[in-house]
């Protein structure tokens, strides 16, 4: 009587790429935009310069941008 042996995946078993589970955080990282991954939002130097370039100066020394944002240096 022949008995069949089922192979179980183990350290020596190589599974095809389609049957491998994804790394634990890969699905979350792919679904999350890069700007949302950091704990605090950061403005780049170019973004700050663009805000300042579009600003209108007020008499109080503050700068109000075209969209109404107030930038205090």
UniProtKB/Swiss-Prot annotation:
Q: Region Disordered: start and end of each range?
A: 1-41
Pfam families membership? Pheromone
What would be an example GO MF term here? mating pheromone activity
Q: Where in the cell is it found?
A: Cell membrane
Which residues are listed under lipidation as S-farnesyl cysteine? 70
Propeptide residues according to the Swiss-Prot or TrEMBL record: 71-73
What keywords appear on the UniProt entry?
Answer: Cell membrane, Lipoprotein, Membrane, Methylation, Pheromone, Prenylation
Q: Which GO terms describe its cellular component?
A: plasma membrane
Q: Where is the signal peptide?
A: none
The Cysteine methyl ester modification is found at 70
**Highest taxon of source:** Eukaryota
Give the protein's function: Activates B-regulated development.
Protein name, entry field:
Mating-type pheromone BBP1(3)
Which organism encodes this protein?
Schizophyllum commune
